[in-house]
Amino acid sequence: MQPKISVLVPFYNCEKYIAECIESIAKQSFTDYEIIFLDDGSTDKSAEIVARTIARHSSLSFSTLRNSRNQGIAFCRNRLLDSAAGQYILFVDADDRIEPDMLAILYQTAISEGADITVSDIFYELPTQTIVVSDSVAATQADNLRQAIEQKIVYAGLWNKLILSELIKQPECRFAEGLNMSEDRLVVIKLYYFASKIAKVDKPLYHYNRTNMQSITYRKTEYHYCQSILFWQLLDEFLIRHNLYDTYRQSVEYSKVENKVLLMQQAVSLRLYCKYSSMFADIQSRFIGVLPYRSQNLTLYLACRRLLFGAYVINLLLKFKIFINNILCRK
């Protein structure tokens, strides 16, 4: 018999948090659901903890998959979806947890409102405090899509969203393998485009764990730059394919430049700063025209102006260096 919900949990080296995650899923007031874990080649005791913890809940439907080697989160999400039998899908990150009534509330709302996607608010757990973050659902598809692209009042994570299985399993919504940062943001944007109706529960039901953040989260390596470029390339292709790019150009271009600024602020080296200073150069000159879209953010505005000017100067210096080298090579 088809379960009403498939809860999908990819994990990799989460031994510190995964037991609490499993317990929160196992103790739901809702009962008609399956839980599928996927071990992406963990090298710690995560798999052992999963086996030991689920053994205490024999009445529930558990299954565990394993990749022979680390494949990345996009591959894992696709494999989990291929194995899921539920009418609805909920992804849960292995270092997070959910409220005991999350499945019940989201499912009841989805059914009563005929929603393809049902969204809850979030407990955002920081090292020193927990705050409630409100997700947003707009009145129109156009506004939902715009907000998902900008990721300002729409949270572009999957984990606070109950999603109709046939929606997220359609071929165009599969996760882009190789994109392992913002892979969920890209899919959420696609889901918001294809969804007939999105419902909202004004209650925090998901605990998003940010207490485990390491300094690498803040200090951006070359991998972060490459992943960012790939994300925007894939999003551009999707929007162009559906004749949406011109409609959302302002949102996309602002978000690209904002993304670049944040990467530059947190670059681990001057080499990276120089190497990627020309990133999105084709739209950088139009930044001032795009900035008023959220001009109230004065701090970001000033940071952007400084960093973009710095990138401009670096580009000039690099061109001058090439020019001098060419002259010397001719001698």
Name the predicted role of every residue range.
Residues 247-255:
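Residues within HEAT/ARM-like alpha-solenoid scaffolds
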Residues 203-211, 218-246, 258-288:
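Catalytic core of nucleotide-sugar-dependent glycosyltransferases
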Residues 1-231, 327:
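Nucleotide-sugar donor-binding/catalytic module of glycosyltransferases
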Residues 77, 98, 102-106, 154-161, ...:
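Hydrophobic transmembrane alpha-helix bundles
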Residues 268-331:
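Membrane-interface aromatic/basic loop that binds lipid-linked glycans or pyrophosphate carriers
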